[in-house]
Amino acid sequence: DIMMPEMDGIGLCRRVKEDVRTSHIPVILLTAKDSIRDKEEGYDSGADSYLTKPFSATLLNSRVRNLLDMRRKLARMIVGKAKDEERGMPAGEVRLSKLDEEFIRRFTDVVTEHISQDKLDIPFMADKMNMSVSTLYRKLKGLTGLSGNEFIRKIKLKRSLYLMTEQGLNVTEAAYSSGFNDVGHFRRCFKEEYGVSPSKYTKR
């Protein structure tokens, strides 16, 4: 609700959306303020949806379902599994906030920079990202639908793909260079992710 004691809904929404720890959380503003200027202020604060009172529970449920569906599509786009029709949707329909884009970019850069690190796990990443382990876990789960370690593995596999297809490394070289210490494990992970073995993929 926009009109609340101590901090109004606009201020709360802005605080949520400007904090990288919570910026991925969808926000619906519910209010009796229905002027164009009020709505502009609401969306400028980062709100994902704006409903004016009186409103129906059916409409609210519909908005919630739509927002959750958009979040699922965003998650698929982040991890590279979006359907063609999702990729082609207008930017305003499926998009990350600048703060969340920067978070994903930074997380990916840190993984790539430390890809040969023996303990490249969530505690290590939390320290590098200046977040608590629980906050980082929730953030990644909210954005990607994956656990932190699952997302790290996807980044490593994508790196291995680049090394094989663009840099000409063989399977063993790509496995070790992308942070896998066991080539057999790498092959299994690769096939699970891409549907074929790494050697078959590179022969396409």
Question: Which residue ranges define each predicted feature?
Answer:
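Receiver (REC) domain active-site loop signature in two-component systems and cognate sites
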Residues: 4, 42
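The feature encodes the CheY-like receiver
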Residues: 5, 14, 23, 35, ...
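C-terminal output helix
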Residues: 55-64, 68, 76
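Short hydrophobic/aromatic patch on the recognition helix
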Residues: 60, 136, 140, 185-186, ...
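Terminal helix-turn-helix DNA-binding modules in bacterial transcription factors
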Residues: 142-181, 203-204
